[in-house]
Amino acid sequence: MSGKLYRTDLGDELATGIVSAARTSLGDTLRSVLYFTPSAFDILYLRQDLYDSTADARDAKAQLVEFEQAGFSEVPVRTAIAHKESSSDIGDYEFTVRFHESGFVVRVLQRDVGVLLTIDSMDVNAFEDAAVAIQGLLHNE
């Protein structure tokens, strides 16, 4: 990964840390790791059996990223809900898990960057491990 040119302002150290955290928590069920901003995205990890080329993967993932970028506009609403003084104290937003027929998409947002993980069907408890590790990396950046 060293020396790779990114479409976002992502550095090699953070990219490596994100992939390592996801691989450690999710193992071979991990399909892809995408880092994104409101205007661009990078593929950090792609399991070998999924696409013929990186260009094919970018084309396939572009619509997913565009959909998940909407999460940036949700931040003020999520913050207001979390901090609203009422009996429904749900706490701060942490991450989103989308359930699909044959797998999952996990979205982690921190300020103006996000990470998407696509995963085969598995035990959902591992999502929290991966999301918390990635939150820590993004928060410290």
Regions inferred by a protein language model and the residue ranges of each:
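Non-catalytic interaction/Regulatory regions outside core domains
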Residues: 1-141
